[in-house]
């Protein structure tokens, strides 16, 4: 699963997920899966979608993951009273804004790419759309 090798601080504030995304263009591959909604993707969700795509294209072509879970999410254990400090880091998430390209693919026909991204999108909690590279 994806997570940073080391961070400056172990725990971070909750923060907000506002604004528009960076990385809105398909830059590595020919086809992409772009976020339409806003939300968070956990490392497990990113990996599950990647596996679904890899199986769908039968390991041909190339897949790029354009998001990285760099925000630690903490949780307190069950049945623990409030207070006594912030909980332990349980998992890592990537904050997603509308327009962000999540995955890219190349070396496969468009129909196969569409099918693979459809399977991947089913694993994700946010609304997505299929995009192709625009040549100027």
Swiss-Prot record:
Cellular component, GO, one term: cytosolic large ribosomal subunit
Pfam families: Ribosomal_L16
A GO term for molecular function: rRNA binding
Keyword terms: Ribonucleoprotein, Ribosomal protein, RNA-binding, rRNA-binding, tRNA-binding
Domain of life: Bacteria
Listed Gene3D superfamilies: Ribosomal protein L10e/L16
Record's keyword annotation contains rRNA-binding: yes
One GO term (biological process): translation
CDD domains listed in its UniProt record: Ribosomal_L16_L10e (cd01433)
Family to which this protein belongs: Belongs to the universal ribosomal protein uL16 family.
Classification via HAMAP family: Ribosomal_uL16 (MF_01342)
Primary role: Binds 23S rRNA and is also seen to make contacts with the A and possibly P site tRNAs.
PANTHER family, sorted: 50S/60S RIBOSOMAL PROTEIN L16, LARGE RIBOSOMAL SUBUNIT PROTEIN UL16M
Subunit structure: Part of the 50S ribosomal subunit.
Name of the molecule in the record: Large ribosomal subunit protein uL16
Biological source species: Erwinia tasmaniensis (strain DSM 17950 / CFBP 7177 / CIP 109463 / NCPPB 4357 / Et1/99)
Gene for this chain: rplP
């Amino acid at each position: 699963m994806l997570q940073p090798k080391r961070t400056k601080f172990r725990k971070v504030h909750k923060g907000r997920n506002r604004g528009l995304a960076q990385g809105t263009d398909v830059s590595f591959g020919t086809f992409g899966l772009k976020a339409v909604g806003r939300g968070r993707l956990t490392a497990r969700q990113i990996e599950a979608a990647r596996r679904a795509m890899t199986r769908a294209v039968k390991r041909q072509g190339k897949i790029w993951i354009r998001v990285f879970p760099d925000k630690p999410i903490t949780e307190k254990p069950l049945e623990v009273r409030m207070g006594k400090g912030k909980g332990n880091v349980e998992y890592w998430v990537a904050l997603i804004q509308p327009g962000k390209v999540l995955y890219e693919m190349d070396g496969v026909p468009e129909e196969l790419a569409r099918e693979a991204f459809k399977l991947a999108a089913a694993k994700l909690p946010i609304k997505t759309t299929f995009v192709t590279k625009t040549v100027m």
